[in-house]
Amino acid sequence: YIFYSFLSLIILASCKTNKDYLSRSDNDNTLFDAIKTLKKHNTDTTALQALPVLYNLAQQRNLRKINSYSSSRELSRWDKMINAYSTVQEMYNAIVENDAASRVVTPVNYQQTLYDLKHEAAADYYTAATVFLNKPGRADAKQAYNYFKKADKLVPGYEDAKLKMDEAY
């Protein structure tokens, strides 16, 4: 008797209905979950209906974050903005790679914006690194090294960042 109860519970758990995508709080992950569902079942009506709403919510939330970060003067704002733009670009990529998803959502491509933002960030990190490099002391040299490294990571081969890293080291 216990065996049948346990078996019934397992069967019910494995046959659960589609998640209500719109009731979940993490729009970014929920959007990717809906796309994953569409990869398996391209006619899943729950995912197809939720996807445009999820994309709009996630896109708007990330753009609000970007707007908020852009008013900051801290160097870390670049990392936060790049992360948010990377998220919406990943959404774009996931949607255009899925026929069912791309039929119900026309996502925005942020690739050029992300490229430009990385160049702006690299310039800011490079400038800050130069300021630290011109100061005496090991701690400032370390900070200069880290900022030159960051500039080169954002834009590989950025100006003479690698040479300056050697100089700071």
Segment roles from a protein language model:
Residues D44-G137:
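Post-signal peptide N-terminal segment of secreted/secretory-pathway proteins
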Residues N18-L22, I35, Q59, I66-Y69, ...:
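Conserved small-residue packing positions in alpha-helical repeats and bundles
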Residues I2-I10:
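Sec-dependent N-terminal signal peptides
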Residues N27, H41-D44, Y158:
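Residue-level recognition of tetratricopeptide repeat
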Residues L9-D33:
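Bacterial Sec signal peptide processing site at the extreme N-terminus
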